[in-house]
């Protein structure tokens, strides 16, 4: 075992590698644009787009289309593999159908080539024509013009009946024209479509065969053509220019030049070639049926041209012939005279047509006469031309003026039409305004008529006539009762009487606190009062109650009526009417009829304290007091309709439904209603007096209460029909019923007076009007509030002193006031204008009452 010594200082582990330190990458610095900014040379987006478009392939659309076609073909092959076989079948069928045509085309092409190559078939080359030299010679040279071979080619004449003459070489002018037409037709027919050319050639060959078979028909046509040519030659003038011309006369002619000779000699070959032309044209018609119409047109044109040329040559020949012979006959002068006569005749016709003077023929002999007539005719023509030119100019000027006038008239018409349209619009607007004005005036007239009908001044005379009757009734009532005097004229408020009507200011207007008994009475009262008194009533809250069982059915009905039905506008009410004397003192001078005794004022106040609805609907032991509001009124203008619909329209139906159609019936009805209102007021006054008497005797024993209760019950029973019988059978029955009720009330009043005498009650201790003057309250500014106590059913039978009268609406206050020898007055507070009750009863007695009923109104 050998040990190898290893050098410890040598490198151990040859696999060790030394770690290489990586160099950090140098930070790339930003472009330094301080010296040169290369962003200027950067391409813009537009340049990039343009370069991109430049480098695009030009065949891109074509390649794209080819790729699409290839894709479609692949798709069709995949979807319909039978299409290729179907197309092959179609091609084979088409080849079978058109094979014969293709074969005929090939045969015809070969035959055409052979015919073009064969030059000696008819001893001349096809399309060979004879030339006509165009040689110009001197005007005075006597050398004849170049001779022309007049003889046609013999082979063409021989083959004229076999081959169409348009394809042959002809010598005469007609032949030249026909060959020119054939060349033009050939050039037109030389189209890229070779099928039509070959078919035409084949048809020509077929017609050639038919011509050989139908020789008889051709002979007949030839004879017809010859006859036509003969008739046409007979129509031409017999004198031919060639026969008339001679060598001797050529020198004596006026215009004996070679030009005239050339003109005369020109038509000769045309006339010579004319029969050949006709024969060739008719043969062409027979052989070429397809080209009959154009050939006929060409023949007609040629005939017209020949006829015109013949006429010209005849005229020239005649003029030259007549001029060339001034010999013994003098034919030229005669011709000139004849021409001048014709000119003169035409001039005369022209003068007659234009309305000019016709000048006679100027006779003359010889050339001088001819020249004179010629010059005169020329002068006349020039003069007529000038006149016509002047007239034409005038017509043009007048036409321009008329056009200008027409334009002016059109402008005027346009302006007039615009003005008419504007006037129509204004007229329509004015009509609409007039219609609206008529409607408004009609409404104002209707409102004015209603206001005049409802004006209280109309009823003044009627009320003045009824005043003595009311005074007499008051006196009879005083005599029967033997008590305080009730004067309907004296104690009645001023606004209730028809003598004078005063408009109260807003701070002095009365407050309405009562409900009218019936609608008819309300209507009568409303007709007697001014319209400014009436205003819509304010809906009030019902009075407080302890329980519904305490109210009778009649009071329940009254309560619902007060809640749901607005109060009619009727005269001033309970507590305020007592101070009407003070109002009259302030507004009017004192009237002696108004100044009555305090007893009359007291009695009238007590009468108006009674609420009309309450006195008819209250029960025996359950009083009901209705308090309604009346805001301050302002007088309405005469042109405005009243707000109350009952007052704005005159009622035309009575209680029994009878209609009033005349003014007399309306006047009678108003009188009856006024009488009913008067009786109702008297009845209420009697009832008020009766209530005062019964309330004053409330302190006595129970034995005295029983007859009063019985009387009250009977009175209620008598009062209810007045409320329930709202529509009696007639007005007379209602008046009688009211009279009966008043008599019953009077009798009851007498009985009660006798009972009071027996008891020993002093009548002078009856309560005076407790209401103070309301002037202080109404003079205050701001809001006024009137609070009236509404008594109800007593809570218990213990408070016997508060027994309520069955008729009076505020009897609870008077009964309580009878104990303390004073009724509960209303203190008019000066600060707030608020009426508060001053009652000597204790708070416990006040709690027993039904509640409070507040009425408020604002004075602007």
Swiss-Prot record:
Segments traversing the membrane: none
Modified residues (Phosphoserine): 240, 648, 765-766, 769, 824
Keywords: Cell cycle, Cell division, Coiled coil, Cytoplasm, Cytoskeleton, Mitosis, Phosphoprotein
GO biological process, one term: mitotic spindle assembly
Chain residue ranges for the region called Disordered: 127-150, 172-201, 230-250, 294-332, 623-645, 693-718, 792-860
Biased composition annotated in UniProt, kind: Polar residues: 139-150, 190-200, 230-245
Assembly notes: Interacts with CEP120.
Function, in words: Regulator required for centriole duplication, for proper bipolar spindle formation and chromosome congression in mitosis.
UniProt name for this protein: Spindle and centriole-associated protein 1
Organism of provenance: Mus musculus
Gene this chain is encoded by: Spice1
